[in-house]
A protein has these predicted regions:
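Core catalytic lobe of class I
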Residues: 1-368
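Conserved phosphoryl-transfer catalytic core
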Residues: 374-375
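Residue-level detection of the helix-turn-helix DNA-binding "recognition helix"
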Residues: 371
C-alpha cells in the first residue's frame, strides 16, 4: 500500500512546487534540455542524467493505431518493432542517471495462431545493445480481459525487464523485502491484479507495479548539486530480535535482567552457532575467535543458557541514509514514463512524494486537474 511504501522510504524531502509534468511528444524522438542537439526531435525540459527511475509500458505491437505516421507499435514486422524499442531506450539513456533503472513492461502477442515471442526477442537485442537485464520479472495477473479463444489457454502474464547501465546502480532490496517479502527476498514473480476504473485506456498496468519498482529502485532523495542518490544504511543491532517470538522475548528479558552488556551480544554473533555441538567440531568456531571474544561468549552462554542462540542472528534495521559530501539540499527522486498512457506511473510516483515527468502522443486518458501539460 501507499502508506507502507511511504513509511519504509523514510523522509522524502518536501517540495512546494512539485507538479506532474506531461509533454506531448514521441517517446522515440526526445532528448534532454541540455543536450545541445539540433536534430529534428522533441527537446524536453528534463536535463541529462536527472531521472532516477523509468517505469513504462510501450504500445503493444499492432494493437492500437493513434493515427500518427511512423508510430511505435504499427510496424509491418516484429523485428522493426524490436529495433524501435531499442532505439527508444537509447534515447532515454541520456535522461537516466548512471545509477538509475528502467522497469520495462512488455507484453506478447499471437500472430498466425502462434505466440510471437516478443519478450525473448527483446531480451536478446537489449543485451546486445549493452544493457544489463538485472531481473526478468513475471507479472502474474490475478484478473484480465476475457479472451474468446477456445483452442488455447488465456494469457495471464506479462514480462517486466529491470534494466541497468552498469553494476553500480541504486537498489533497496531491504526496503522492498520489508513491504513485499516479510523481511526476505520475495522473488521475481509479481502476483498483481489490474486496477479497476482505468477509463478507456486499453492496457493500463496496476499501481502496484509502480509501487514495487519505486520501492526497489527510486531513491527517496538525491543531491541537488551532483545528483547522487542517498542509499539506505542497514545494520543489525544486537538486541533487535523479533519480540513476537516467545523465545526471542524471553531472551531479551534474561539479558536485560542480567549484568551482560552489548559486547557480550557481539561476541555471541562472532562465535555464532559454531560454538556448540557438532558445529563446533566441524567449523572450529571457538578456535577462530580472539580469546577475549570467546570469554565474553562463554559468560553470555552461562547466563542465557540456550537462549544465547537467539542473539546469533539479530534482525537488520535502518539506521540512516548515506549520500555524497556536497552538504547541500536534497530533492525527491525523479520518476519518468515516456509512454505515460493513463498516468498510472506519474500519479503513483507523485502520491509517494517523488517528482514525476511523462510524455505521450495521446493525452486523452489523463486527468487534467492532476497534471501540467505542454505541447
Amino acid at each position: 500500500s501507499f502508506s507502507e511504501v511511504r513509511n519504509i522510504q523514510g523522509d522524502i524531502p518536501e517540495m512546494e512546487d512539485r507538479p506532474i509534468n506531461v509533454e506531448r511528444a514521441d517517446a522515440c524522438e526526445i532528448h534532454p534540455a541540455d543536450s545541445g542537439r539540433e536534430e529534428d526531435c522533441h527537446q524536453l525540459e528534463l536535463e541529462s542524467e536527472s531521472v532516477n527511475l523509468i517505469v513504462t509500458s510501450p504500445p503493444y505491437w499492432q494493437l492500437r493505431d493513434y493515427g500518427i505516421d511512423d508510430q511505435l507499435g504499427q510496424e509491418d514486422d516484429v523485428e522493426k518493432y524490436i529495433e524501435n524499442l531499442i532505439n527508444a531506450l537509447n534515447r532515454w539513456k541520456d535522461f537516466l542517471h548512471p545509477k538509475g533503472s528502467i522497469f520495462f513492461n512488455l507484453g506478447d502477442k499471437y500472430h498466425n495462431k502462434s505466440v510471437v515471442g516478443i519478450p525473448g526477442m527483446f531480451a536478446q537485442r537489449v543485451q546486445e545493445d549493452g544493457w544489463t537485464i538485472r531481473n526478468h520479472i513475471i507479472w502474474a495477473k490475478k484478473n484480465g480481459i476475457p479472451d474468446p479463444a477456445d483452442d488455447r489457454l488465456v494469457p495471464r502474464h506479462e514480462h517486466i525487464f529491470h534494466l541497468v547501465q552498469n553494476d553500480d546502480y541504486y537498489y533497496d532490496l531491504f526496503g522492498y523485502s520489508q513491504v513485499y517479502g516479510n523481511g526476505s527476498n520475495p522473488g521475481d514473480v509479481w502476483h498483481m491484479s489490474h486496477d479497476r476504473n482505468t477509463g478507456d485506456h486499453l492496457a493500463p498496468f496496476p499501481q502496484e507495479l509502480v509501487l514495487r519498482a519505486a520501492t526497489l529502485a527510486c531513491p527517496p532523495k538525491v543531491c541537488t548539486k551532483c545528483g547522487e542518490p542517498y542509499s539506505r544504511k542497514v545494520e543489525r543491532p544486537p538486541k533487535n530480535l523479533n519480540r513476537d517470538r516467545p523465545q526471542a522475548a524471553r531472551a531479551i528479558k534474561k539479558f536485560e535482567d542480567s549484568d551482560l552488556n552489548e559486547e557480550h551480544l557481539e561476541a555471541i554473533r562472532a562465535v555464532g552457532i559454531s560454538d556448540a555441538g557438532k558445529a563446533k567440531v566441524i567449523q572450529g568456531g571457538a578456535e577462530n575467535n580472539d580469546s577475549k571474544v570467546q570469554e565474553l561468549a562463554e559468560e553470555a552462554k552461562e547466563v542465557l543458557g540456550g537462549y544465547f542462540r537467539e542473539f546469533t542472528f539479530p534482525l537488520p534495521k535502518t539506521v540512516g541514509w548515506s549520500g555524497c559530501d556536497c552538504n547541500v539540499d536534497t530533492v525527491p527522486g525523479m520518476v519518468f514514463d515516456p509512454f505515460a498512457g493513463s498516468g498510472t506511473t506519474l500519479n503513483t510516483a507523485y502520491s509517494l512524494g517523488y517528482r514525476a515527468w511523462g510524455t505521450d502522443l495521446d493525452r486523452s486518458n489523463f486527468e487534467p486537474k492532476l497534471n501540467h501539460y505542454s505541447d
